[in-house]
């Protein structure tokens, strides 16, 4: 098989039809998967020795949340080092990063893999990966044909990165090339709430306005502050962090504004405060609602006039600091209750941002779970860490009162438990590995069954086995709970399982 002019033209047209970059990238890899008749395709962006998925087709949704560090993925490292098409033999000893991440093929290894590095000039900007379950999946395509595809993809990605750079207000070093921008914090999520938050961050980052970031505990307010700072003209200067909730009243003023030698017992030398450290940069005040009213008044003066006084010093110091503040409280209610100054609230909330709780972010929980699974895989030296269908279903229906932080800890704990009960370096997280309170789950969806040559009885039994297996996984292998979920008698369920060969 070879590409016709019509096929290449169709790929080029699809790259122009999308409204935004994300839509175009998705059209590209979906079209490639159809043209190449492969099982999975992915477009990855290269940034700081890691590949970041931009669009996928045929892969588990959680792949979009993963960050593939080169040191943990030898195949991707080989692609990054190559200047041309990379074909991995079916018997390659290098593990495939997508093993266990192709839906319906979780237990099988990827057999055919092609990597296409994408360049803008001499700079590596990304890669296309193509995967198939058949060893000879890509043998019919020549390297020259694959290079044409890589050229089309590289052009689309290069244009997107240039436009992204022009739209941002980052001040790049004078010698920097267009693809050597300051590394920015990755905010994982495609839900409407997160998409809106990212747009608002882009808008406010270019200004010098103070920002009040509100959200429940564990939603990632500090990450939002980092993203604002890194996308601002102050990115080359420091971002200084201060947790107001952890400040004892006796040292809070010194921490903020500094002190001079002899100002109080223990002040054996002059010391700069957080405002001085953040001069020409950004100061992030976490849990600002915990500050005393006295300190709120002094903070207000700094925001109004731009000068500070060290404790024990009569002189004023000028500082140029942008303040980002975060709180998990409703500061409007705190103002009404007399616990927070109204004038300070208005000074801080010139551009308020609200971080949505995880329970309102839909499928973002699966993307974030994929990110944390990849983190655990690297830290523990495992070959792969993936979620079972039952585990994914559980995560999507748990409300996560502790938000993203709770999800992170839950994934780490589950990996440790799963690793302890499984031999080898491959970990599959099941529902029973998560210690969540009672979660009401909907009946499991029927797994997609490929059309195969089998009679109705065989197909029915296969469906019954899969349904029972998923229900057991979701109920920690408790047969009584499984029977209740499936709305059947437990004795009948045991008999059916025996007939299906699932029990002795």
From Swiss-Prot:
Pfam family, one: Sigma54_activat
DNA-binding region ranges: 479-498
Functional pathway: Nitrogen metabolism; nitric oxide reduction
Listed CDD domains: AAA
Gene3D superfamilies: 1.10.8.60, 3.30.450.40, Homeodomain-like, P-loop containing nucleotide triphosphate hydrolases
Family annotation (SMART domains): AAA (SM00382), GAF (SM00065)
Gene Ontology molecular function, alphabetical: ATP binding; ATP hydrolysis activity; DNA binding; DNA-binding transcription factor activity
Keywords carried by this UniProt record: ATP-binding, DNA-binding, Nucleotide-binding, Phosphoprotein, Transcription, Transcription regulation
All residue ranges annotated as the Sigma-54 factor interaction domain in the record: 187-416
PROSITE patterns recorded: SIGMA54_INTERACT_1, SIGMA54_INTERACT_2, SIGMA54_INTERACT_3, SIGMA54_INTERACT_4
SUPFAM superfamilies associated with the record: GAF domain-like (SSF55781), Homeodomain-like (SSF46689), P-loop containing nucleoside triphosphate hydrolases (SSF52540)
Function: Required for the expression of anaerobic nitric oxide (NO) reductase, acts as a transcriptional activator for at least the norVW operon. Activation also requires sigma-54.
PANTHER family assigned to the protein according to its UniProt record, in alphabetical order: ANAEROBIC NITRIC OXIDE REDUCTASE TRANSCRIPTION REGULATOR NORR, TRANSCRIPTIONAL REGULATORY PROTEIN
Protein name: Anaerobic nitric oxide reductase transcription regulator NorR
This protein's encoding gene: norR
